């Protein structure tokens, strides 16, 4: 698969759904990246999944296990926000579950830059005659920015939160501290703090 692959509207739609599933896992995955996936059979979504808390199933396994009639997986397509892992850790490799399931086509939103993966998952799938297409997604790349930085640069991504009033004050005249940011910016700050890399580097 290359960047020259052509994708339909539905391909982009399903990948965006996978991105939304990945967003559900933010702040709960420890040192793992937040990943989401959608399983499709004959243009019908038959399952969805996202990375479970550390030590529990990854997104792909989570989705596959939720399909009660496993025969539906034969010939199905799976849209993964990130390249499926191919190594043993606290869980089995996701590519093994995909290969055994009978899924015949895998769409990937980004390549996992973690050196222990980085294309190995794709290679395993293609070796098993499973078609792989890389549908690069900017939102997914942004979602995994902190994770990639921790694995490639071996250091946390430094983020700073700075706020002041229009007259450059950070407290009232009687020194009482007040919120000077709105609820949206506070929620975004909490989201960044609880991201997987923040958990990984806080110990």
Q: In which residue ranges do the predicted regions lie?
A:
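Short, basic/aromatic recognition patches
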Residues: 11-29
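Short, compositionally biased leader-like segments
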Residues: 1-17, 122-137
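Internal gly/pro-rich beta-alpha loop/helix module
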Residues: 112-153, 163, 171-195
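Short beta-strand scaffold segments in enzyme catalytic cores
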Residues: 35-40, 162
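Residue-level signal for inorganic ion chemistry
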Residues: 18, 36, 85, 125, ...
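Single conserved hydrophobic/aromatic residue that forms the stacking wall/gate
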Residues: 193-203
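Zn2+-dependent cytidine deaminase-like catalytic core
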Residues: 39-139
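Short, small/polar residue-rich loop motifs at catalytic or cofactor-binding pockets
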Residues: 31-34, 157-158
């Amino acid at each position: 698969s290359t960047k020259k692959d052509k994708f339909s509207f539905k391909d982009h739609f399903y990948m965006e759904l996978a991105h939304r599933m990945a967003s559900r896992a933010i702040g709960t995955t420890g040192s793992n990246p937040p990943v989401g996936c959608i399983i499709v059979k004959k243009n019908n979504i038959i399952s969805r999944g996202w990375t479970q808390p550390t030590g529990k199933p990854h997104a792909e396994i989570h989705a596959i296990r939720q399909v009660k009639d496993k025969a539906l997986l034969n010939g199905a397509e799976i849209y993964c926000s990130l390249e499926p892992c191919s190594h043993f850790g606290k869980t089995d490799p996701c590519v093994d579950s995909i290969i055994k399931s009978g899924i015949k086509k895998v769409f990937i939103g980004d390549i996992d830059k973690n050196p222990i993966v980085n294309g190995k998952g794709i290679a395993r799938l293609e070796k098993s005659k499973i078609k792989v297409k890389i549908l690069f997604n900017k939102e997914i790349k942004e979602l995994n920015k902190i994770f990639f930085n921790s694995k490639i640069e071996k250091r946390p991504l430094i983020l700073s939160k700075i706020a002041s009033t229009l007259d450059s004050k950070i407290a009232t005249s009687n020194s009482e501290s007040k919120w000077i940011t709105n609820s949206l910016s506070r929620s975004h700050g909490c989201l960044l703090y609880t991201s997987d890399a923040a958990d990984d580097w806080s110990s």
